[in-house]
Each structure stands twice: as structure tokens, then as C-alpha cells.
């Protein structure tokens, strides 16, 4: 399965800055009924720990345009508490995905927009995103415009 363009467009426009890789995993499980093939421990450009999820041809972080660096061995020890916390969250989400979505307002809103927004509107938002990025316009401005 390829990365879903509608979902990426919504994540990068109307929901920019609101979602995490855990949220993306939950959305993929809810919308596409797919579980991740692999879990990757990573850090972002600021050195903050983040869990990433690998699917067939993409990672959850790609929906958010995040560049994450995988960590191994001793680096994992440094982030042990964050790893435990995020793995526990992932397990809770996987245990009852429907309940998790129901109790998370931004994910409920995302799914509603994903299901109800027309392809034309999402395509228009994606086009705005491409133009804005080419001109160097900030994501926050794009989010407000969509």
C-alpha cells in the first residue's frame, strides 16, 4: 500500500503541527485497517525522542514531513523512559483503536474531514501547499488558509 495523498494533504494543511507519529499510526489503523510492519526508535533534529512506524513503502513520519534519525544501542538507554512511555501509548491505542479515536477530539475531527471533504477540495489544498512551499511561505499560514 502506498502513502495516501488525501491523508498527507490534510496532515500538512488543516492539521499541521497538531499530529504526532502515534496519531498517524492510529489514523492509519482506523481508516485503512493497517498495522505497522515495524517500530523504529528515532530522534528529531532537536534530539527529542520520537517513535516512528514503518509500513510497506513509507513511514508515519513522512505524513508529517519529519526527518527522523534512527537510534540504536546505547542511545536507546538515554531515551529509555520516553521509549517506555511511547510504547505503552502505542499498545493502548492498538488495544482499542475505536475508543482511542472517540476520546481524541483532533483525531475525530481529522477522520470527519478525511471522509467528508471532497477530492476537489483536498486537491485544491494540496495545490495551495505546493505553491506556498515553493514560495517559502510558512506552514502556519497555509494551515489558516485551508
Curated annotation (Swiss-Prot):
Name its cellular compartments.
Answer: Membrane
* Membrane spanning stretches: 10-32
The record's Pfam families line, in alphabetical order, gives:
Pox_H7 (PF04787)
Instruction: Explain the induction of this protein.
Output: Expressed in the late phase of the viral replicative cycle.
The organism sits in which domain of life? Viruses
Keyword hit for Transmembrane helix: yes
Major place of residence: membrane
How does the record say this protein sits in the membrane?
Single-pass membrane protein
Q: What does this protein do?
A: Contributes to the formation of crescents and immature virions (IV).
Q: What is this protein called?
A: Late protein H7 homolog
Amino acid at each position: 500500500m502506498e502513502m495516501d495523498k488525501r491523508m498527507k494533504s490534510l496532515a500538512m494543511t488543516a492539521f499541521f503541527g497538531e499530529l504526532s507519529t502515534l496519531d498517524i499510526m492510529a489514523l492509519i489503523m482506523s481508516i485503512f485497517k493497517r498495522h505497522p510492519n515495524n517500530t523504529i526508535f528515532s530522534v528529531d533534529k532537536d534530539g527529542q525522542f520520537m517513535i516512528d512506524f514503518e509500513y510497506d513503502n513509507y513511514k508515519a513520519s513522512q505524513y508529517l514531513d519529519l526527518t527522523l534519525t534512527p537510534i540504536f544501542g546505547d542511545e536507546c538507554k538515554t531515551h529509555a523512559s520516553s521509549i517506555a512511555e511511547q510504547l505503552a501509548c502505542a499498545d493502548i491505542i492498538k488495544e482499542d483503536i475505536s475508543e482511542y479515536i472517540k476520546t481524541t477530539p483532533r483525531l475525530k475531527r481529522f477522520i470527519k474531514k478525511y471522509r467528508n471533504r471532497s477530492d476537489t477540495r483536498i486537491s485544491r489544498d494540496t495545490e495551495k501547499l505546493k505553491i506556498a512551499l515553493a514560495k517559502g511561505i510558512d506552514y502556519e499560514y497555509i494551515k489558516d488558509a485551508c
